[in-house]
Every structure is written in structure tokens, then in C-alpha cells.
């Protein structure tokens, strides 16, 4: 699964938008947002999902930034500094 370049745009111009996410953490976080956010995002074309419901790509920088900021509220226990490269990876899962 590839997270697109739009994810890296989440942190462009902003430092420490959200904490670092180790393998699997990003997927679990998005599952937590699924009921309240992802349905509308998918319908509007901001996020595409494959049959396994894993994130395929972001296509909107504004929406990527919005959910990145929500991460601080959802995973407050992750206090490490964010590394943009950890989100922009072909091997994130």
C-alpha cells in the first residue's frame, strides 16, 4: 500500500503537526476515524479505499492536513517528534 505524496504535504510549512506513527499505527488511527469521518471523505473523493478498507491515497492536501491535526486528539500518548518521511513510505504497513 502506498501513501501518496499528498501525505507529505501535511507537514509542509508546519512543524510537529502530529506525532510519529510506527507501522500499523496510522492504519489503526484511520480505522478509529472511520465512522465519524471517512465515509464522507470517501464519498467526496478525498480518500480512496481498496476492498480491504486500507488507505490507498489522499488526494486533497487540505483534508490530509485536517485529519493529521485530529491525530493529536486521538493519539495523545504518542509524544515523539513527527518525522515526515515515516508517513511517506511504500512499506508503511
Predicted regions: what they are:
Residues 1-93:
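Short, surface-exposed polybasic-aromatic patches that bind anionic ligands, especially phosphate groups
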